[in-house]
Curated annotation (Swiss-Prot):
One of its GO terms (molecular function) is zinc ion binding. This is Testin. Residues 92-199 form the PET domain. It comes from Monodelphis domestica (Gray short-tailed opossum). Pfam families: LIM, PET. InterPro entries: LIM1_Testin (IPR034958), LIM2_Testin (IPR034959), LIM3_Testin (IPR034960), PET_domain (IPR010442), PET_testin (IPR033724), Pk/Esn/Tes (IPR047120), Znf_LIM (IPR001781). The N-terminal and the C-terminal halves of the protein can associate with each other, thereby hindering interactions with ZYX. Its main location: cytoplasm. Keywords: Cell junction, Cytoplasm, LIM domain, Metal-binding, Repeat, Zinc.
Amino acid sequence: MDLENKMKKMGLGHEQGFGAPCLKCKEKCEGFELHFWRKICRNCKCGQEEHDVFMSNEEDRKVGKLFEDTKYTTLIAKLKTDGIPMYKRNVMILTNPVPAKKNVSINTVTYEWAPPVQNQALARRYMQMLPRNKQPVAGSEGAQYRKKQLAKQLPAHDQDPSKCHELTPNEVKQMEQFVKKYKNEALGVGDVKLPSEMDVKPGDRSSLDGGDRGTTAEVGAVEDKSSADKKEDYSCYCCKQSMKEGDPAVYAERAGYDKFWHPACFICNTCSELLVDMIYFWKNGKLFCGRHYCDSEKPRCAGCDELIFSNEYTQAEDQNWHLKHFCCFDCDSILAGEIYVMVDNKPICKPCYVRNHAVICQGCHNAIDPEVQRVTYNNFNWHATEECFLCSCCSKCLIGQKFIPIEAMLFCSVECKKMMMS
């Protein structure tokens, strides 16, 4: 019965988002179909985050599980039905005040996430300081960006063994210990405040609880009540530029409250992307997203994208691979001991390379085997043989000789060129 339930869960996982269009490949993709272990679409090879898959509840569960058994439990709520922790992200709805007139609709803007602060004017100013294409306004490019970063920065398979492929009991135990360790030592959530508010060290930090799941506020101005008493030159820990008076800053408790960042500077040290929902990992004086923090601690399989907890794994092409996952990216055949070619940083077996990726010889019009020599000029290729790399007029072999190129044609002399072109 347990096996049946596990198989059912696995099936449901692979059905999620099935058929969703790819936002990157458009009509070239037949629709999302999850590869059995690669975590990409079998049709177009793009990740699930590149497809138009509705993942709101799934992402809230993932972040909820991340915050479980941490000091950030105020940001989650457990469902009464199954006890699954759900992320209580703060949804902010801003209402622009308009003159009292008849038949005038109220202009509202909904942010799918906003910093959980009580001063909503401060939260609004925080949003204004982000690049417009990264502001998570519902239905916008920024909302799509946030969704993509949730998938990229916080992979479910970096924290939940059940999301991984065929872990041994020992690997499950190692992963659970690893997750517990980074929750205790590195995980944090940014806090938004005015720098001047931090002149006095807080004896009791303001609660991280975002309150109700949805918050409505009127647009107003940010008011810094303490700025009149004392003005300081505050500089961003990332860009070293000064903070403008009245502008909010982001703090990371694990970094210490003497450090703060512009909202747009609160980024991962490796990928330089905004830390999604201000969720960070602190290590050696640097901010990381979840993915790149884990990469700094454990090898990651370039095949399945999971962290490697086994003592035995393969290293090839400056990447790490589970032994069973060093496979052809096109056909999944094992490549150990086989000839392969790297295409876009992915290993391809020789038959698939010749069939799908090989360049075509302009001389014989056949695919060029990856193991044979070839001549390349601009975007044209030839076998480096007497039969293929020759003058288009007199058929003289041009290997080691000067030649005159005209598109895909080659000439040994001006005379041959004139004769052929006349």
